[in-house]
């Protein structure tokens, strides 16, 4: 049956009346010609509903654009190669406060809103924490009415879909645009030329200019981002690469040379084909650099266009005004090319001199660091850079030269440090540009993402710069949006919170959650809290059954670790712990087993396609699960499940249903973590190390409500040295767990290389670099404390309540408010 058979179509702008909304949905089903008008299945219902909601968004988005144009406030532009948006429908109707109206409207067609929302594909234009942080930030920027936009790339295929096969993880292209995205608006009026390769021309008056090479176009797609209960909607502008008709060689085509006729078109397609193309080859590296430049150049041309558009007289200059109207935030070093690109546009296109251009650039750009892992600090080959971006390389060389001169002339005492602080590393074997150094030298502010991480930046990674620019360095502890990560993903718990706080204002003022503390021992609250958790656990159990076929018991302790698979995050320690638990259960008498706290250990996450040890870890979790879950002696007390294809919408099911969550990285290595905040907010207790934001979470929720173990960050270097010097004595339990795997208890796959990475000096020559062996005994002891605590239901529910109550600090509204005041210098600009 078609939508029109059920509800009369109406083009009227959507209102908040369910009948009018139903008419509007029916209208979109009929007149947005994506599907046959005869059928109205759940998929069609999703697209028609989304288009109807988009009408609301567009109204706000247009109003906001005009309001910003008229009032001309200072505006922030967030440059990020990644956004992990996930699904948008539930969030959009929630933020617009029209969830009930849309739920009622859909009932007229016989549909539940939740089921229709489940039809949407995740927009996974990011890898992990950094990308999801960018998405939480957009939600907070809109909610706080801040004049700010995000810029990114419109990848054709997002983060790969993960399938678990016999050999382990398989990657499949994630086709989020398979049909189309109802949320994006293609902007044929917003197009900028982007040049690659070519050469630098010098005119008779000595002016330098980039010319030649090939020129593609950047075409804008706008995704409106609604704030929570505000009229403001901001923009996430995603760039796609295109070539023009002029680039199509009709002569060659008619001559049968089809491929060479459309060469530039196919090169344009490559730019935004995939998120993070493999960079093991030179081609892969070049493509990644092209992507980065494409984002930076298109965004800066657009920013300059808008700067001029908002006041007619800016066409003729007033560049010193630019930093009072524009703030550019670089999300890690991936958009570092914004620095030389802004310099180039100001000097070569707008005609400024170096000093003037440098002053403007320096006052405009700021840099957030998200990692201290040496292998994750970007370095680009000078040769590749020279070939692809010859004019930018000149500018970078000049920045490097001037920085050296400045240090030599003003800081004699720092001379010995210059080589490591320089932007260029001229090591003859492999000359590179150090992108983080460029960001520190050129930006006005550098920030880390949690207290501990920011201190490590100041004391270690960037210590030398601190002595030159003591005021450049800041901390901005990460946050998460309480809308998506409690209000919308956990409606049961949200209702309880609202009921006990007697207000739902916590949704945009998360500090109000502390008001729950005074009810932490209230038996009525305990009963409601436990019932909500059980409902979420059942939903989680259904998801697990659907995607893995494994039945798990909602009365067991749900213990979850979900995040990218990485050795520093130590999923391997988790699974060794599960193996040890399994072995002890096997050795126990049946009577003793009955005293054990039943547990379901769940692990989820994607391994980078070429990261061999991470893929081995995925395989090991699956292999351990296959044995344990089918062992009738013990599977009442332990299940081990690998959750495939972890993504934002899976997180929205898993986090509310978890009770214990693992954040167990080697201290000093996880810059912040943000899922730790989501778990804690949803009343889940953390077992973790003193790393990243765990430190601050533990402070906020109280040390009794956090299971702490492991070495501290300042011990790690010494422990590694001891280990190298043969001073490490492994705990017998650690040896036992490894030996059990080596014995073949979990199948015939060869885990030797993985386990060897935990031994002496064999792990890539750095022997258990992540200190699994050192932390294992205290981890096992902490897990034993968890088992005991869980037996006391009252105690556990209280810990759970106090975790939620102590999570107020971790709202991204707080984080963004601090960025706005302390880095960007922008203020709210609400649409009247
Ligand atoms: C940290 N991703 C978390 C989170 O601040 C932190 C790196 C290279 C290329 C592509 N993506 C990346 C990251 O570095 C990343 O996700 N970093 C994470 O940023 C937000 O909470 O501790 O590991």
Curated annotation (Swiss-Prot):
The keyword Cell inner membrane does not apply. The keyword Transferase applies. PROSITE patterns: PHOSPHORYLASE. The modification N6-(pyridoxal phosphate)lysine is found at residue 678. Keywords: Allosteric enzyme, Carbohydrate metabolism, Cytoplasm, Glycosyltransferase, Pyridoxal phosphate, Transferase. One of its GO terms (cellular component) is cytoplasm. Its cofactor is pyridoxal 5'-phosphate. Its main location: cytoplasm. It catalyses: [(1->4)-alpha-D-glucosyl](n) + phosphate = [(1->4)-alpha-D-glucosyl](n-1) + alpha-D-glucose 1-phosphate. It is an enzyme of class 2 (transferase). It is found in: Cytoplasm. Phosphorylase is an important allosteric enzyme in carbohydrate metabolism. Enzymes from different sources differ in their regulatory mechanisms and in their natural substrates. However, all known phosphorylases share catalytic and structural properties. Belongs to the glycogen phosphorylase family. This is Alpha-glucan phosphorylase, H isozyme.
